[in-house]
Structure formats: C-alpha cells, structure tokens
C-alpha cells in the first residue's frame, strides 16, 4: 500500500506527551479538530447508522467512538481535539429535539451518559496523551437548560443551582446592543429556556471556580473552550480561567474587533470571529473582497492583545458550513489553508475535510461516520499537507508561533502572507479564482527569500527558484493555494518525500 508523505511525516512528529496543565504557550503550537461527540463516531463503528439532522435527536456518537477514530484525526496532522460539553443534560425530547449537542445542561456534577461513562472520558484523555495530543472540552458557565417557558421553570431540577436565587430574573434578550441585557437576560425562548446564572453572586462564582478545577483535574483536560462568554460579566472570567489552570478560549460571537478583542484581557484567547466574516466573504465566491480580509488581518494583529492565541476557523456548529455557500473545491482548499497558516490556533470542524455542506443549525451537525472516514478526499489531503508544514515549521523555528502573520501582497483575487523567522518562513498564496481559474505566474515580492534560493511548494510538491531580483515566480493554476518553504530546510522531513 502506498503511504502519503504527509502521513509518514505527521506520525513521526507527534510523539512527545503533553505537559500537565497545558499553558497558552503550549497551545500556540496546536492544531484543533472540533467535533460534536454525538455526531463523530459510534462505539459500534457503524458508517451507516441513520442520523437525520432535522430530527435533532441523539445519533449515538460516543467518547469510545472517538478513541477508535483517532488515527483518522491524527492522520490530518491535528494535535488536539475539542469535544462538546460533557455534563448531564435535560432528559426530555423537547419541541427542538434532544440536548445531543450538550448546551442544555441540568447537572454539572454528572456526565452525559449518552456519550459514555467517566472511565470512557478518562480513557479518551489517556488515548490522546499517549499520542502526544491534547484534549479540549467545551464548558458552559452562563446558563442551564429547561424544557419549558422561562416564567415557569422548576429550578429544583438543576444541580447544584437548585433554586431561583442562583439565577437572574427571567427576561429574554431583546436588544443585543444593550450589554446589560446581553449579560443579565436569558438566551433561548419560551419553548426551551436557558435560565441565566447570576455570576455576580459569590456563591455562584465560587461553585463554578471549584467545579472547573475539579473537571480539569478529574479528566486530565488540557484546555477549555468556553461557550457564550459575552453573556457573562467580564470580571467573572479571570478567576474562572485561573481556577481551570489550563488554556481557555472563549466564544464571543461578534465580528467587531473593538468588541471581541478586549475579552482577551480576561481570558487567554477567543475565537477569531473578526477574521471569520471577511475570510468567509473573501472565498465563498469568486468575487469576494481580498481588501477586507487583508485589512482585518492587520487590525486583529494590532488591536487584539495577542493574535497568536486566537482560534482561526470558518466552520462550526453555529454557522453554516463553507460548502453551503459554494461547492467549488478550490475555494474550500484556499480557506482551509488560510485557517491552518494564519496566526493563532487552527480549528477545523468535523466534516469540513469531507466537504460537508450543511447550512444553518441543525443541518450543519451531520454525522461524520456517514462519510465513511475516507483519507483520500481532496480536503483531507490538503489539510494534512498544510498541518504538516505548519507542524514542521514549529519544530524547526522557535519563533514561528509568535511571529505575527504579515500580508505581503493583495490584488482583486489574491492574497499572500508570510509567517516565520527570516530563513524559515512559510509564504502562503491564496486565490479566490475558483477551480476554473486560469494559469499564470505571479511575481511575488516581499517574501523575504534570497536570490537563487530554491523553494518547495508543499501542496503540489513542486519547486520554484527565487529570481535575481528577490521576487518569487509563483505558478498559479486552477485557483489552488500555494504554500512555499525553503527546500533545504525540508531535508529529512519526509515532506514531499524529502530525504
């Protein structure tokens, strides 16, 4: 059987066991595969078990199922997984279906038995650590979940927050421009209400701080993704982050860097929604704006406390999948390459590698097993190649992860950027011309390479030579991304079969 170069490289690189209590600095070097536990893999290994997203029901994914498919994840070069919340949920099938996603918790001290047992979760953590990989777990501090109207909640079902005293008075958020409403009123509606915990109260705050430290310790968790961060007052978060003792990345669902970036002053990182919107718009069609993306890269770099600790993504369970906008595989390859080679921590959502095309929730929560987990799909291979060069650059250049991505070129259809210390930099050239894009040579200045230097384009495994003027002649065709790295630096790496 022929084994791809990137497979040999990736398995060779990921051998070091993670340190206890993974720090923000440790997480800079990671690449995250995000999955909904219920939708990724089943214990029985089925690739045909029905999962109708419109039903919004449990489909049978488990922690053991994830363990059994870690080869598939690691084969793409990912060094970490992020799984959805593990706490026990409301048990009813509501008008909106089951709490299969994990965001309608009722008992924070019990696990969701649909996913498995405590031993299963510990086994998942151990299996990851044996591979040198990290475990990130999703957590919710803002709210609980109740099957019914907010005005008639039976608070006794919540553990440990078993009385109304722990919660803000019921009111639904009407105006998202009013931060007081955003923090004090409730998400959800009167069909499934999300009772909003009053995190200004010491009894609530202390309970959460004790709980999160225990969760991390009990299951050897390396990092946390925190849901609905903007719905909790900022002064709650530093203590929570400290109590967790690991890297925390928060969901602040807002594309304005002036709103989102300051949350990095109260926790380690946030999901990079400011980049998400211009990134999506640049590549979801062949007429997208490269100007907006170019400008936002620079804005985030200058305005966020540390852009190298943000999470870069274009898909998740809350937003429509990229392929719901366009089925052009070349555009999908470009956006995936950007995610992996931009500043910060790359996040790819399960199914993105198989070009899943679900739109809004619940359509974007497809079962990964129905793809059959092929490892020869176009995007699987592209993601593996991009992760491979990123992982390799990190291993060879101590400054790679803290070097801030520098856009060096743009035109109506192209953006180029460099990241990494002089002599070891990766230069990425992205196009939104799409699969029908023409063939031409881009003369690229500002890459920082030396005249006559040979570069390897690691996606297609071709080489180019830097011109006498220092410009790089980059062959472009079919709208595909190009990723350049000094050929001499690849010796012994197995990347593009370098010996």
Curated annotation (Swiss-Prot):
Subcellular location(s) of the protein: Secreted
Disulfide topology: 51-59, 171-185, 261-304, 461-496
Residues modified by glycosylation: 218
Source organism (scientific name): Aspergillus oryzae (strain ATCC 42149 / RIB 40)
Gene transcribed to yield this protein: amy3
Active-site residues from the entry: 227, 251
InterPro entries per the UniProt record, alphabetical: A-amylase-like (IPR013777), A_amylase_C_dom (IPR015340), Alpha_amylase (IPR006046), Glyco_hydro_13_cat_dom (IPR006047), Glyco_hydro_b (IPR013780), Glycoside_hydrolase_SF (IPR017853)
Needed cofactors: Ca(2+)
Amino-acid positions noted as binding Ca(2+) 1 in the UniProt annotation, renumbered to this chain: 142, 183, 196, 231
SUPFAM superfamilies: (Trans)glycosidases, Glycosyl hydrolase domain
Keywords, comma-separated and alphabetical: Calcium, Carbohydrate metabolism, Disulfide bond, Glycoprotein, Glycosidase, Hydrolase, Metal-binding, Secreted, Signal
SMART domains: Aamy
Listed EC numbers: 3.2.1.1
Catalytic reaction list: Endohydrolysis of (1->4)-alpha-D-glucosidic linkages in polysaccharides containing three or more (1->4)-alpha-linked D-glucose units
Annotated positions binding substrate: 104, 143, 225, 230-231, 255, 365
Site (Transition state stabilizer): 318
BP GO terms, sorted: carbohydrate catabolic process
Molecular function as annotated in GO: alpha-amylase activity; calcium ion binding
Residues passing through the membrane, by range: none
Family: Belongs to the glycosyl hydrolase 13 family.
Designated name of the protein: Alpha-amylase A type-3
A GO cellular-component term linked to this record: extracellular region
Assembly and binders: Monomer.
Signal peptide: 1-21
Cofactor binding note from Swiss-Prot or TrEMBL: Binds 2 calcium ions per subunit. Calcium is inhibitory at high concentrations.
Amino acids binding Ca(2+) 2: 227, 251
């Amino acid at each position: 059987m022929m084994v791809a170069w990137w497979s040999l490289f990736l398995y060779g690189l990921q051998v070091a066991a993670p340190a206890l209590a993974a720090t923000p600095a440790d997480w800079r070097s990671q690449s995250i595969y995000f999955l909904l536990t219920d939708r990724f893999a089943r214990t029985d290994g089925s690739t045909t078990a029905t999962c109708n997203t419109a039903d919004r029901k449990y489909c049978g994914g488990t922690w053991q199922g994830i363990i059994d498919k870690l080869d598939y994840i690691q084969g793409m070069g990912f060094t970490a997984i992020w799984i959805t919340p593990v706490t026990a949920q409301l048990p009813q099938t509501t008008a909106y279906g089951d709490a299969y996603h994990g965001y309608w918790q009722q008992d924070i001290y019990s696990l969701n038995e649909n996913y498995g047992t405590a031993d299963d979760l510990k086994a998942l953590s151990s299996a990851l650590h044996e591979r040198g990989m990290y475990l990130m777990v999703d957590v919710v501090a803002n709210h609980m979940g109740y099957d019914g109207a907010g005005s008639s909640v039976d608070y006794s079902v919540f553990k440990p927050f078993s009385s109304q005293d722990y919660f803000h008075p019921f009111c639904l958020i009407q105006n998202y421009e009013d931060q007081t409403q955003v923090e004090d009123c409730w998400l959800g509606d009167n069909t499934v209400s999300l009772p909003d915990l009053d995190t200004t109260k010491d009894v609530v705050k202390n309970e959460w701080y004790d709980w999160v430290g225990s969760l991390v310790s009990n299951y050897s968790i390396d990092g946390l993704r925190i849901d609905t961060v903007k719905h909790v007052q900022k002064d709650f978060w530093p203590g929570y982050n400290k109590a967790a003792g690991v890297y925390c990345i928060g969901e602040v669902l807002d594309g304005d860097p002036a709103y989102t970036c300051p949350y990095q002053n109260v926790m380690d990182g946030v999901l990079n929604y400011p980049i998400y919107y211009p990134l999506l718009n640049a590549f979801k069609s062949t007429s997208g704006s490269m100007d907006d993306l170019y400008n936002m890269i620079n804005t985030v770099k200058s305005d966020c406390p540390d852009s190298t600790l943000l999470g870069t993504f274009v898909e998740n369970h809350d937003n429509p999948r990229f392929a719901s906008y366009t089925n052009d595989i070349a555009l999908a390859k470009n956006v995936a390459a950007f995610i992996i080679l931009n500043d910060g921590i790359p996040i790819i959502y399960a199914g993105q590698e198989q070009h899943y095309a679900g739109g809004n929730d619940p359509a974007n929560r497809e079962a990964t097993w129905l793809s059959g987990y092929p490892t020869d799909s176009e995007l699987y291979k592209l993601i593996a190649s991009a992760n491979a060069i990123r992982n390799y650059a990190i291993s060879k250049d101590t400054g790679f992860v803290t070097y801030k991505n520098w856009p060096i070129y743009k035109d109506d259809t192209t953006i180029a950027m460099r990241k990494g210390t002089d002599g070891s930099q990766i230069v990425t050239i992205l196009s939104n011309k799409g699969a029908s894009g023409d063939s031409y040579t881009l003369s690229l200045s500002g890459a920082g390479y030396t005249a006559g230097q040979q570069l390897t384009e690691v996606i297609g495994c071709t080489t180019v030579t830097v011109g006498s003027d220092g410009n790089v002649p980059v062959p472009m065709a079919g709208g595909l991304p190009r990723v350049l790295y000094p050929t001499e630096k690849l010796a012994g790496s197995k990347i593009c079969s370098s010996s």
